Amino acid sequence: MISLLLILVMSLFFSGIIIRTKSILSGRKGPGILQPMLDILRLWKKGSVVSTTTSFIFQIAPTAYLASVIMAVLMIPHGDKPGFISFDGDFIMFAYVLAFGKFLMIISALDTGSSFEGMGASREALFSMLVEPAFFILLGSFALFTGQNSFRDIFSSLHYGSQISYLLGGLASFVLVMIAMIENSRMPLDDPKTHLELTMVHEVMILDNSGFDLGLINYTTNLKFAMYGALISNFFIGLLPLEFSIPMFLAIQIGFAITVGIIESFMARFRMGHNPQFVFILTSVSLLIFFGVLLVLGKFV
């Protein structure tokens, strides 16, 4: 439960820290850290305009999207403290609960009958499909490394004792940072501020969403960022007591947000044809982690 509370708190500030970092690096004053959340609150006070060509799927998709992410957040532990939902193989359910929310957002984009939104939905589906092997190879490698098969047991059993194992932790953090940026449609795969429909991915999917529904989608993006930050922090928290683990959690989340801001400040968006190649590289990095685990365990023949 403590993990849920910490993630909810960080979700209020995450997007603001990213924007503030980008503002400082570009020499601008920029908005306050809470401005993105204030924008979301303003959207929540408005009604939603729903096209007459859409079905009930378009109306329930934003709520189901948020619910799926909250369900996934409930499975994330905090060090040796289990999540609200914890069982053997929970990381598999974690991935497919997120996939369920993404699926509903994709079919809601198709439900509008817009060719632009259908184009964005196909791109989103492709990138999510390419990310999935990297996530499962990564978590499967650490399950093999620790001999455990649940989030809580994997993270509480991590034992770093060699240079290779420290390298594995660094590579795992890199993979999760990239997965978070891909899943939230950030640079270098997508530009959340672009106004050119032909280069959009996530933004073109939600062109018909407005008001309260758009606020739900934007907040869910912040929540997903904080959720992946919590996964990264668990690689380093281990068995630390709460008085040390909570400050470390917050420091890692802030560092994660600053890292995203730095990446977006100094990297241009890739050409659309290069995006699948970049996403698939994450699977190669996850395979390196898998082979590293085999080396550490002495099973590499």
Task: Give residue spans per PLM region.
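Juxtamembrane boundary at the C-terminal end of a transmembrane helix
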Residues: 289-301
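Alpha-helical transmembrane segments of helical membrane proteins, especially in multi-pass transport
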Residues: 203-206, 210-245, 249-261
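Juxtamembrane inter-helical linkers in multi-pass membrane proteins
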Residues: 27-44, 191-212
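Transmembrane alpha-helix boundary signature
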Residues: 70-85, 105-114, 144-150, 297-300
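Alpha-helical transmembrane segments
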Residues: 1-14, 86-99, 161-183, 244-245
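Juxtamembrane/interfacial segments at transmembrane-helix boundaries in multi-pass membrane proteins
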Residues: 142-169
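Cytosolic juxtamembrane amphipathic/interface segments immediately preceding
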Residues: 42-58, 115-119, 206-212
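Interfacial loop-to-transmembrane junctions
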Residues: 259-288
